[in-house]
Amino acid sequence: HGKFRRQRQMCIRDRYEGQQLSPDLLEQIQSAGRFREIYKKSLDLLAQREHSIWELRQKLRQRFTGFREVEPVLLQLEEQKFLCDERFSLNFVRSRMANRSWGAYRLRAELQQRGVAGQWIEQAIVSEVDESILRKKVEALVRKSGFPTDPAAKRKLAQKLYRRGFSQELINQVLSQDPL
């Protein structure tokens, strides 16, 4: 950042050479430059993948420590619909349901870790998680692991499934069936 900041200050000085710049005007010009820099980096990150507002805020704060322009950039991105936790949570759940064997509890926890508000998490879970698909995922994981016959193996498999975010009720239902 230091090299870029010095280059920007030199450009500002060259552009306004011979003019008297007040400290306030100089700060406004520099702030506008920082805003553009942060905005561009935000778009670069969002082009790679969708982010929650919290995730993007963390990345920008880490990269642009002490810059107060981070929050205005995030607000502008939200206004322009480039950044939206509702859309992020729906896409996240849809993607994980298609590509991972995770249950609703794990999905909820992952979204909470990404700073998504509870209302968007619940909306995404309700609209994208189908109990019959969860059941099929649990059954597939049980088949893959081999149906446990002894109680210790059943407990171990149940714990594994629980860590993946499946409900205890669903796990018990599948494990209490005859082997598939």
Labelled PLM ranges:
Residues 59-66:
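Short helix-coil junctions and helix-kink-helix linkers
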Residues 1-4, 8-12:
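Single conserved hydrophobic/aromatic residue that forms the stacking wall/gate
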Residues 13-35, 39:
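Short Lys/Arg-rich amphipathic alpha-helical segments
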Residues 46-53:
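Short capping segments at the starts of secondary-structure elements
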Residues 85-163, 170-180:
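Strongly charged, low-complexity linkers/loops
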Residues 66-73:
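Short amphipathic alpha-helical interaction segments
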